């Protein structure tokens, strides 16, 4: 389960960014072609965030669908797997979306001094 290591890195990156401030919400974008299971990341997040400034934060995960462009005819096609075939018969596709893993938003508590 590589999601544990990925989630540990996400917690470390967000903790560094928050600089000790309490994190309320995180929005991740995970591509459907990335081989990362959103449910596993959610499960690991609850464990990895314990005792950190992220504990209790809401983790929102937005899944990004797979999309590719055919090198032969230029058509864009939806992908459910990291490979596919275009309507023109070509298998030469460039993936446009679906492989990403991004920390898109981080919401931290404001500290008034």
Curated annotation (Swiss-Prot):
Sorted UniProt keywords: Metal-binding, Nickel, Zinc
Per its UniProt record, what Gene3D superfamilies does this chain match?
3.30.2320.80
Q: Which PROSITE patterns match?
A: HYPA
Disulfide bonding pattern of the chain: none
Q: Name one Pfam family in it.
A: HypA
Entry keyword annotation includes Zinc = yes
Instruction: Return the HAMAP family for the record.
Output: HypA_HybF
GO BP of this protein: protein maturation; protein modification process
User: Which residues are involved in binding Zn(2+)?
Assistant: 70, 73, 86, 88
Family according to the record: Belongs to the HypA/HybF family.
Protein name in the entry: Hydrogenase maturation factor HypA
Chain's role: Involved in the maturation of [NiFe] hydrogenases. Required for nickel insertion into the metal center of the hydrogenase.
**Superkingdom of this protein's organism:** Bacteria
Q: Where does Ni(2+) bind?
A: 2
Molecular function via GO: nickel cation binding; zinc ion binding
């Amino acid at each position: 389960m590589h999601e544990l290591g990925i989630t540990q890195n996400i917690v470390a990156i967000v903790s560094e960014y928050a600089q000790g401030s309490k994190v309320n919400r995180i929005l991740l974008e995970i591509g459907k072609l990335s081989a990362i299971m959103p449910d596993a990341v959610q499960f690991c997040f609850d464990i990895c965030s314990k005792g950190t400034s992220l504990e209790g934060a809401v983790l929102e995960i937005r899944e990004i669908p797979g999309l590719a462009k055919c090198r032969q005819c230029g058509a864009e096609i939806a992908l459910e797997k990291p490979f596919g075939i275009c309507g023109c018969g070509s298998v030469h596709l460039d993936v446009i979306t679906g492989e990403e893993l991004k920390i898109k938003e981080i919401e931290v508590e404001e500290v008034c001094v």
